């Protein structure tokens, strides 16, 4: 392989200047597919000579400075390209002109148009349309600013990719060590790293000394991984001789040659993949779009029909255009945009109190319609701390307490064997508590040391008191640290116990290796020879604990005889001058990262809510399956193919996969699957665990679920999860353990890292969907009594019953608080017991909702308004039949002798005062019938009497709208400002019977729905 090969396939192909858009798009898709493939490299297989040939690097002196400068010029700096961010002004414009706002803008423009037409054609005209246009524009701008502020506040996007690049790196060039900027590291550089450093680029290790790296941000595995020059695995992500860019070196030192830099590193590929993925449209955005189509359709249909009708009725063109505009504007629910924004914001605030931080307001609802959750294991389902789970000593398994608050079972701590075991676990252990934590509970203390050793340290500290004092009593003389060839750790301590020899040798390590070094075993404090029977007992215990997905360690000791090893003996760990065989076996201790306490309950809730929970983890299949069973992702009694094969004692290949409800898929099998095979697994198995998966596979799993039509939520904390988080319908990152990159890709952040918070989120999301429906039903209903006066005015030629300004007073005044108050309504029934909604069929606004709001309740409201209108005119001398066809004379300011039914003559001024009084009364009637509408909108199925009136905001809303209506009617000066006049108290009561009718009508309808579920009434009217 020549230099530079293997790099070329990531270089962007040259696109000709006039290369069309399609070419670019296809290329982008090709690049994305390339990134989704597994990491392929062969540097880990090359010998040192081949490496030297491939990169032209002297393995002791490094590159020359000149050569390094050439490569830097060719490849560019070793940095990740930051993801493309949307400029703030674009985000702001989206809020101002997106979706619903567009409808209001069109309304405002039409108003200005109508005002312009009137101003040009008549000397004397009113300014209603001008006011209306200004108010509409103001509504859009104010709600736009509000949504923008809300989103900007919750998504202060972290500059996370910048923080990931280590600032300095130690390279060897021209045979000299020099510290340079990490951005200047080039392919072929010889780099040195030590404990505490971040790895500056992808390295092929050529020499190492006790080096361990923490790959958790990349693979999700919490255990530090050993790094050495040995080629140990075909898979570059698993082999020991490659260290990855931006992972941390925890201990030891290593030297390596840089094989990839910047965007070409494994981490860089993941980052590019995440920033290149398109997140789709959120379900609620799609719903609102669908709703706008409906409303616009209705408005335009009515407008055009009446435009044609008014021409047939011999109105002039100009009048007809004014009518058209009037009808379209009356149809637009001006207050709805604000209502939806406020409802989503309230829910986002409520979720923040429950530890869910929502970055994108629309994501609030998406979580409610989720049908599949792909959850990471470590830290989300589990506590993300290794904990001692079981011990095996005195030939039986003892259970330790793994609960977060130590409320579980404990075991017999009096046995002499346990004392010996705890002594080894405390002494043969390099973990220490960090300083100044004496006041913290033991489990909460920070530990310096690897995960398994800290688990042992905390366990012994809890059971046996201070480990520090134990270590002071038994001073350490020498130790052999754990290494991958012997697989044990050993130390020798001074022993001050009078009845024991002066030196104590303790050892721990891989159980089978430890057992091989033992010839006796301690049972109930007495040493016995290790026979076959006891070896079998050990083997069974080891298999049982391993089968629980636990990490098992074996412990043994030896009391060194004083005659051979007197006081002051010089122990030598290089030329070993003390026994490491024929030791005495004490017992096993097994550890696991235990499930969080609230998770099994949360998984159960998901199941009853019809949500499928899939575990996707980088961990071992056995551990993954054990945790899945522990939290209920694989429920009791459900078997995998392997379980069935074991039970029937037949080979796995003979089991029909469809007989197994549960399924554990290994990453290496997933690699060779076609998308059809993956679809089959997702379709036919209800309980699925994917283990040993790579970041790219997470993404493939998410896409597979989406092909099934599922709305997918993904949880994750590592950088490795960011592509899947971005692709999912809703990405959920972890607030505590999460890397910045994953937080940036996500839509929502769990502040307490707890899976149970997701379930709370689902509940809130479902509730907001229900409540938005109610809010919209309430808001839309008053559209009918707002439009019909205009239509009757055109058809029957009567004085206008309701003016434009009064319509605005309803939409932006009296209806606002009640509509928002419905967002505080509690759930009617257990919303977590029903299936997730199907986004294709179960819409936010459907035909049934429109038919209820417009066709039924709205019509009753309109009747109430007209009744009041006719009563007032009749009291003033104009009987209903006398009004037909009177409009032309009525609106003519030069006619001052219009006669009423009793022959009285009315001047223009007097007529207009009566007309505006009618407007005010019609407005008040709408408020009165909206009382009933608000109360019936509280529930969709239950009776209002079942639901109760616990919603204080709603009760306030009722009083607020009434007070506002009274204020507008009786406040002095309103006659000039809004042309609203005081009403006789009796006129308030005209609409009461209609209000009562609405309430009774709807209660009967809901009663029928409850009595006959699935019947005709439910099919036609349940929205």
From Swiss-Prot:
Subcellular location per the Swiss-Prot or TrEMBL entry: Cell membrane; Basolateral cell membrane; Cell membrane, Sarcolemma; Cell projection, Axon
Propeptide regions on this chain: 1-5
Keywords of the record: Acetylation, ATP-binding, Cell membrane, Cell projection, Ion transport, Magnesium, Membrane, Metal-binding, Nucleotide-binding, Phosphoprotein, Potassium, Potassium transport, Sodium, Sodium transport, Sodium/potassium transport, Translocase, Transmembrane, Transmembrane helix, Transport
Gene (name only): ATP1A1
Residue ranges of the region described as Mediates interaction with SCN7A: 596-717
Known catalytic reactions: K(+)(out) + Na(+)(in) + ATP + H2O = K(+)(in) + Na(+)(out) + ADP + phosphate + H(+)
Listed PANTHER family: SODIUM/POTASSIUM-TRANSPORTING ATPASE SUBUNIT ALPHA, SODIUM_POTASSIUM-TRANSPORTING ATPASE SUBUNIT ALPHA-1
Native source species: Oryctolagus cuniculus (Rabbit)
Protein name per its UniProtKB record: Sodium/potassium-transporting ATPase subunit alpha-1
Residues at which Mg(2+) binds: 717, 721
Active-site residues, record numbering mapped to chain: 376
């Amino acid at each position: 392989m020549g230099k530079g090969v293997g790099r070329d396939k990531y270089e962007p192909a040259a696109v000709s200047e006039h290369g069309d858009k399609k070419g670019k798009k296809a290329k982008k898709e090709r690049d994305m597919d390339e990134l989704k493939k597994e990491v392929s490299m062969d540097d880990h297989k090359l010998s040192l000579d081949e490496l030297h040939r491939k990169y032209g690097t002297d393995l002791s002196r490094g590159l020359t400075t000149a050569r390094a400068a050439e490569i830097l010029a060719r490849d560019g700096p070793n940095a990740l390209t930051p993801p493309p961010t949307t400029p703030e002004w674009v985000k702001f414009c989206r809020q101002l002109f997106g979706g619903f706002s567009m409808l209001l803008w069109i309304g405002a423009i039409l108003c200005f148009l109508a005002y312009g037409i009137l101003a040009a054609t008549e000397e004397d005209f009113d300014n209603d349309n001008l006011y209306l246009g200004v108010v509409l524009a103001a509504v859009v701008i104010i709600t736009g600013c509000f949504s923008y502020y809300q989103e900007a506040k919750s998504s202060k996007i972290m500059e996370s990719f910048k923080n990931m690049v280590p600032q300095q790196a130690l390279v060897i060039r021209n045979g000299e060590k020099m510290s340079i900027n990490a951005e200047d590291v080039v392919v072929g550089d010889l780099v040195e790293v030590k404990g505490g450093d971040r790895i500056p680029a992808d390295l092929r290790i050529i020499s190492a000394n006790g080096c361990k790296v923490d790959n958790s941000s990349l693979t999700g595995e919490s255990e530090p991984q050993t790094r050495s020059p040995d080629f140990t695995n075909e898979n570059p992500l698993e082999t020991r001789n490659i260290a990855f860019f931006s992972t941390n070196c925890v201990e030891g030192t290593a030297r390596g040659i840089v094989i990839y830099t910047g965007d070409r590193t494994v981490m860089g590929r993941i980052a590019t993949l995440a920033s290149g993925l398109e997140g789709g449209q959120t379900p609620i955005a799609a719903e609102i779009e669908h709703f706008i189509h409906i409303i616009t359709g209705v408005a335009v249909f009515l407008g055009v029909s009446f435009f044609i009708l008014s021409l047939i009725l011999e109105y002039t063109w100009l009048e007809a255009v004014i009518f058209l505009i009037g009808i379209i504007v009356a149809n637009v629910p001006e207050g709805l945009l604000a209502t939806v924004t406020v409802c989503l914001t309230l829910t986002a605030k409520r979720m923040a109190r429950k530890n869910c931080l929502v970055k994108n307001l629309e994501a609030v609802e998406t979580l409610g319609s989720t049908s599949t959750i792909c959850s990471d294991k470590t830290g989300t389902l589990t506590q993300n701390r290794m904990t001692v789970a079981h011990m095996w000593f005195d030939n039986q398994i003892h259970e330790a307490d793994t609960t977060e608050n130590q409320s579980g079972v404990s075991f017999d701590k009096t046995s002499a064997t346990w004392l010996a075991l705890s002594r080894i676990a405390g002494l043969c252990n390099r973990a220490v508590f960090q300083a100044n934590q004496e006041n913290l509970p033991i489990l909460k203390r920070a530990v310096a040391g690897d995960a398994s050793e800290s688990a042992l340290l905390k366990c012994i500290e809890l059971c046996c008191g201070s480990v520090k004092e134990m270590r002071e009593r038994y001073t350490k003389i020498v130790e052999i640290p754990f290494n991958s060839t012997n697989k044990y750790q050993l130390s020798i301590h001074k022993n001050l116990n009078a009845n024991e020899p002066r030196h104590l040798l303790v050892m721990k390590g891989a159980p089978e290796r430890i057992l091989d070094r033992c010839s006796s075993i301690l049972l109930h404090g007495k040493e016995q020879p290790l026979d076959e029977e006891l070896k079998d007992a050990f083997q069974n215990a080891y298999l049982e604990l391993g089968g629980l997905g636990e990490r098992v360690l074996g412990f043994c000791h030896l009391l060194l005889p004083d005659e051979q090893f007197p006081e002051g003996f010089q122990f030598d760990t290089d030329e070993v001058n003390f026994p490491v065989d024929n030791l005495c076996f004490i017992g096993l201790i097994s550890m696991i990262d235990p499930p969080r306490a609230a998770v099994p309950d949360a998984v159960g809730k998901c199941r009853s809510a019809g949500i499928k929970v899939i575990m996707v983890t980088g961990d071992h299949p056995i551990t993954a399956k054990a945790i899945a069973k522990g939290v209920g992702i694989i429920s009791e009694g459900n078997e995998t193919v392997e379980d069935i094969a074991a039970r029937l004692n037949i080979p796995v290949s003979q089991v029909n996969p469809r007989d197994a409800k549960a399924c554990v898929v290994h990453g290496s099998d997933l690699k060779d699957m076609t998308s059809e095979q993956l679809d089959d697994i997702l379709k036919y198995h209800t309980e699925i665990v994917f283990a040993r998966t790579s970041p790219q596979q997470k993404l493939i799993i998410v896409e597979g679920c989406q092909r099934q039509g599922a709305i997918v939520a993904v949880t994750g904390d590592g950088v490795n999860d960011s592509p899947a988080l971005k692709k999912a319908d809703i990405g959920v990152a972890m607030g505590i353990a999460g890397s910045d990159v994953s937080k940036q890709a996500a839509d929502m952040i769990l502040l307490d890292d707890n899976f149970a918070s997701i379930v709370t989120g689902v509940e809130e999301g479902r509730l907001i969907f229900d409540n938005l429906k109610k809010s919209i039903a309430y808001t839309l209903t008053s559209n009918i009594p707002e439009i019909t006066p205009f239509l009757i005015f055109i058809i029957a030629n009567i004085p206008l019953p309701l003016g434009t300004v009064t319509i605005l007073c309803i939409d932006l005044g009296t209806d606002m608080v009640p509509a928002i108050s419905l967002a505080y309504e509690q759930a009617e029934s257990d919303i977590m017991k029903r299936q997730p909604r199907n986004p294709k069929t179960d819409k936010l606004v459907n035909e049934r909702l429109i038919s209820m709001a417009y066709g039924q309740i709205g019509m009753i409201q309109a009747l109430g308004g007209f009744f009041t209108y006719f009563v007032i005119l009749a009291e003033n001398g104009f009987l209903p039949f006398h009004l037909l066809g009177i409009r032309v004379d009525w609106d003519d300011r030069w006619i001052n002798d219009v006669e009423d039914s009793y022959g009285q003559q009315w001047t223009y001024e007097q007529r207009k005062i009566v007309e505006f009084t009618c407007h005010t009364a019609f407005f008040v009637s709408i408020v009165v019938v909206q009382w009933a509408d608000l109360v019936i909108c509280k529930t969709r199925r239950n009776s209002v009497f079942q639901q109760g009136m616990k919603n204080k905001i709603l009760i306030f809303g009722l009083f607020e709208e009434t007070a506002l209506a009274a204020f507008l009617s009786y406040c002095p000066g309103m006659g000039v400002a809004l042309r609203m006049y005081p009403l006789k108290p009796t006129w308030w009561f005209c609409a009461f019977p209609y209000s009562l009718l609405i309430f009774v009508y709807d209660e009967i309808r809901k009663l029928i729905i409850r009595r006959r579920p699935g019947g005709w009434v439910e099919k036609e009217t349940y929205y």
